[in-house]
Amino acid sequence: MGKKLLPGLIHRLPQNAMSRTMGKITATPFSRLAIQRYIKHYQIDTSIIEKPASEYRTLKEFFSRRLKPAARPIAPGPDTIVSPVDGTVSQLGDICEGTLIQAKGKDFSVSELLGGSEEEAKRYYGGKFITIYLSPRDYHRIHMPVTGDLSSYCYLPGRLYPVNKLGIENVDRLFARNERLVTHIKTDSLGDMALVKVGALFVGSVKVCYNTATTNIKHGRQTHEKIAGTPRYEKGSELGWFEFGSTVILLLESNELEWATGVEKGKSLLMGQALATKKA
């Protein structure tokens, strides 16, 4: 009975308010008392984090922790795209007729994901996509998958359904309905890319390094703006972070790419490992 009621319940929850409240709680000094329990529960490897766990002032600060520089080597080569995050591949494949796969029997469109811009969406038709789920135990900083220029970003307010198996299998067009922040990247030889950071239930917010854009704002409005100066970011450099677990979707325009060995549905990825390469 409980399992049958749960899918219906997630539609009725005040998801955004709950997530903002969670963000406030995890930012209190009191929350640091939960850090050691969090480490133990999720079996987090503290040997690779930037500083001792005792030096984090809040649970939110620990959650968005940085790693030691050598912890995530970046796969070299101008024709190699790397994983922007640590996580698990939930879906990947070709973008056929402007459609992405969420789960068996559940699809959604590129246009919906990018906020309804058909012009923006069409450049990815015939390209590739990969959806990577970040669990609460994962490293939650987001990095550049390639060296490229940041041309624009789009903030899309929405719901905050859970992005775990329960949400993916029971919420139609979940990733096109949840709040998200899209960064558009232009590269020298690998085509355009869109890095979509998807909000989720209990995600305090998503933040980026290139401006003050953030998510989970009360009464937030859709925004699409050019990024001042079109800054160039190197492959592997930090782009932003989640303040709790969530999902990243990477759209690749080029149809001349192939997935790297071991990049498959259900497989774990580390930030910086080879994701795709240009066909020889």
Swiss-Prot record:
Modified residues (Pyruvic acid (Ser)): S246
GO cellular component, one term: plasma membrane
Main subcellular localisation: membrane
Enzyme Commission code: 4.1.1.65
Catalysis: reaction(s): a 1,2-diacyl-sn-glycero-3-phospho-L-serine + H(+) = a 1,2-diacyl-sn-glycero-3-phosphoethanolamine + CO2
KW Nucleus (keyword) present: no
Required cofactor(s): pyruvate
Active site: D86, H143, S246
GO biological process: phosphatidylethanolamine biosynthetic process
Pathway: Phospholipid metabolism; phosphatidylethanolamine biosynthesis; phosphatidylethanolamine from CDP-diacylglycerol: step 2/2
Sorted UniProt keywords: Cell membrane, Decarboxylase, Lipid biosynthesis, Lipid metabolism, Lyase, Membrane, Phospholipid biosynthesis, Phospholipid metabolism, Pyruvate, Zymogen
InterPro entries associated with the record: PS_Dcarbxylase, PSD-B, PSD_type1_pro
Protein origin, superkingdom: Bacteria
Subcellular location: Cell membrane
GO terms assigned for molecular function: phosphatidylserine decarboxylase activity
Membrane topology category: Peripheral membrane protein
Site (Cleavage (non-hydrolytic)): G245, S246
Subunit field text: Heterodimer of a large membrane-associated beta subunit and a small pyruvoyl-containing alpha subunit.
Family: Belongs to the phosphatidylserine decarboxylase family. PSD-B subfamily. Prokaryotic type I sub-subfamily.
Record's function text: Catalyzes the formation of phosphatidylethanolamine (PtdEtn) from phosphatidylserine (PtdSer).
Name of the molecule in the record: Phosphatidylserine decarboxylase proenzyme
Source species of the chain: Brevibacillus brevis (strain 47 / JCM 6285 / NBRC 100599)
Lineage, highest ranks first: Bacteria, Bacillati, Bacillota, Bacilli, Bacillales
Gene assigned in the entry: psd
